[in-house]
Amino acid sequence: MFNWFRRQFGKDNTAPESAPPEGAEVSPELAPEVIQAETESPSEEDSQTTELAAPPPEEPSSDTANPDDYLQWAKAAYQNIQARKAETVSPPESAAAITVEAGIEETAEEIVVAPESDQATATEADLPSPETEITTGPAWLQKSDRLEALKETAVEEATVAGTLTAESMAMDDDFMWSAKVLAAQGRSAADVSAEEIDWLRKLRQGLSKTRVNLVNQLKSIVGQGPLNEAAVEEIEAILLQADVGVEATDYIITTLQDKLREEALPPEQAIEFLKEILRSILDRPLLSLPSAEFAPEAEGLNVWLLTGVNGAGKTTTIGKLAFMAKQSGYDCVIAAADTFRAAAVEQVKVWGERSGVPVIANPGQNTDPAAVVYDGISAAQSRNVNLLLVDTAGRLQNKKNLMDELAKIRRIIDKKAPNATVESLLVLDATLGQNGLRQAEVFAEAAKLSGVVLTKLDGSAKGGVALAVAQQLNLPIRFIGAGEGIEDLRPFSSYEFVEALLNG
């Protein structure tokens, strides 16, 4: 099982902890050109298997590697992905559908928490089915719920169509770029999965709007030697348009200017140096932390609070995180504590069904969010799960109310689960740019934030806001979203982000 939370990043890293797949008996017709290139005796099935399971001998470890090495690495990775696909034959569609439906029904039944104290706790009898809830209440609420349900259905249909699988994968330009990024991080071709290739493809495409406006203009400027005043002003304008922010822009220009005074760099080398600057900005908030890794602790309960303004994608992020946690081998529960926004609880339940994760909710109106969190902790403890995800209200009308609510939730957690590892993540809409950053400053004051989840990168030309978050708020980017699908949220890698931003 591939653990997305503990996936290792960074240039020249060793292979990840997850063990490489066992050697597969690969049919020559899967990738004949690779077999002929890498085996001296193609007729020997065992020798083919051994060579495919082991890393190719010429795996590149840096951007200076020979392009032919990357090509061989990509071919080997492609062949291994296809070999694993051949090993695991998919069940018939009807059986798969039955399994999924059964899982969803079982999940719906699990939205039950037995009361453990005087706190009000939701029981199965109290929780009407989604159909019942949508048909009760005022007409305006019914209409709102129906719209939310239709919206979620539309997103789900779009999700399936946009996901790349081993069957639909081709060795196209996206695959070659993704393979090069993975190889440059020291990854083994035997360890690469179709899911990783698919994610890097989406990240590259998601940052294309920012990249088109950024790279070509920068190359034409930085390749002309030391920066004069006109060049500085032009670079400043380019970076600010990408919402890099004033502080980060000043730092980038100063550092780049100092370097170009020392030596004249051709455009490609200047861009490589610019990549180093950007990575240093993104990684700086991690320097003061004990570990750069952000993953649920294997032992004990982890409580992750998700905060952010309405419309930033907070509830959607909850569902995607739950799905990723389950895929990575963690047991997870969601607490629907956003009781302020209409239909928020219903939206969380839809995402819970999709991800196959139980949702703890209170069907009453104007429920105390802290009571829902209490019930969520009780459910997590009784089921011995690793991770509790808490959806909180996205309010900025009154900072005092926000601070009071978050403080009350933290008190409940400290009392009910004193040994839990508590993290607070801010969900930020990348399309808002600097406006979103100002909202983030309010949440940073109200909550002890552990990091930021940057969403909607696929619809924005303002991907530079990630640099502004790191520079101005000194907050690490923990996860990024580049699509509407349930698999389109992944842990953040400064190396992969910068490569997609400047070298895509």
Curated annotation (Swiss-Prot):
Q: What is its EC number?
A: 3.6.5.4
**What organism is the protein native to?**
Synechocystis sp. (strain ATCC 27184 / PCC 6803 / Kazusa)
Pfam families from the UniProt entry: SRP54, SRP54_N
Give the protein's function. Involved in targeting and insertion of nascent membrane proteins into the cytoplasmic membrane. Acts as a receptor for the complex formed by the signal recognition particle (SRP) and the ribosome-nascent chain (RNC).
Q: Which keywords does the record carry?
A: Cell inner membrane, Cell membrane, Cytoplasm, GTP-binding, Hydrolase, Membrane, Nucleotide-binding, Receptor
Q: Which NCBIfam families match?
A: ftsY
- Family the entry assigns: Belongs to the GTP-binding SRP family. FtsY subfamily.
InterPro entries recorded: AAA+_ATPase, P-loop_NTPase, Signal_recog_particl_SRP54_hlx, SR_rcpt_FtsY, SRP/SRP_N, SRP54_GTPase_dom, SRP54_N_sf
Q: Which residues are GTP-binding?
A: 308-315, 391-395, 455-458
Gene Ontology MF term list? ATP hydrolysis activity; GTP binding; GTPase activity; signal recognition particle binding
Where do the segments described as Disordered lie?
1-71, 116-135
The protein's name? Signal recognition particle receptor FtsY
What's the protein's topology in the membrane? Peripheral membrane protein
Tell me the GO BP annotations in alphabetical order: protein targeting; SRP-dependent cotranslational protein targeting to membrane
> Where is this chain's protein located in or outside the cell?
Cell inner membrane; Cytoplasm
What assembly does the database describe for this protein? Answer: Part of the signal recognition particle protein translocation system, which is composed of SRP and FtsY.
